[in-house]
Amino acid sequence: MAKKKRTRGPKKEKRIVPVGVAHINSTFNNTIVTITDPEGNVLTWGSGGTAGFKGTKKGTPFAAQLAAEMAAKKAISEYGMKKVDVLVKGPGPGRETAIRALQAAGLEISLIKDVTPIPHNGCRPPRRRRV
């Protein structure tokens, strides 16, 4: 039997998104940087794990820096991004480092906003550690 020749569909065109939103979710265990378009559709992302770190090293500021750099470089090269609004969530050690890394990678930061959820006396927090 002769093999059927597969026809490819039209290639996906490159979108140019000059302005985006960088969401930085920084916990004590990891930092996740997600870059979206203004509507909230994810374009690219990076985390301490995708930067090559495992275990407790994912929560370090250096891991956050590499994660933000990776996400920013991809956003610049693939989508032509120039400006970002930064929304930071969480209490982790990688917050400031990730913002600095976005700026160092060549993105212009127009806004930094803290969107950390604060309970109005909600769930009981975890107990204090005794080391």
Curated annotation (Swiss-Prot):
Q: Which Gene3D superfamilies match?
A: Ribosomal protein S11 (3.30.420.80)
Q: Name one GO molecular function term.
A: structural constituent of ribosome
NCBIfam families per UniProt: PRK05309.1, uS11_bact
Q: How does it assemble?
A: Part of the 30S ribosomal subunit. Interacts with proteins S7 and S18. Binds to IF-3.
Q: Which UniProt keywords apply?
A: Ribonucleoprotein, Ribosomal protein, RNA-binding, rRNA-binding
Family of this protein? Belongs to the universal ribosomal protein uS11 family.
InterPro entries of this UniProt entry?
Answer: Ribosomal_uS11, Ribosomal_uS11_bac-type, Ribosomal_uS11_CS, Ribosomal_uS11_sf
- Which function does this protein serve? Located on the platform of the 30S subunit, it bridges several disparate RNA helices of the 16S rRNA. Forms part of the Shine-Dalgarno cleft in the 70S ribosome.
Lineage at the top is: Bacteria, Pseudomonadati, Dictyoglomota, Dictyoglomia, Dictyoglomales
**Gene name?**
rpsK
Q: What is this protein called?
A: Small ribosomal subunit protein uS11
Q: Which residues form the signal peptide?
A: none
Biological-process GO terms, alphabetical: translation
A GO cellular component annotated for this chain's UniProt record is: cytosolic small ribosomal subunit
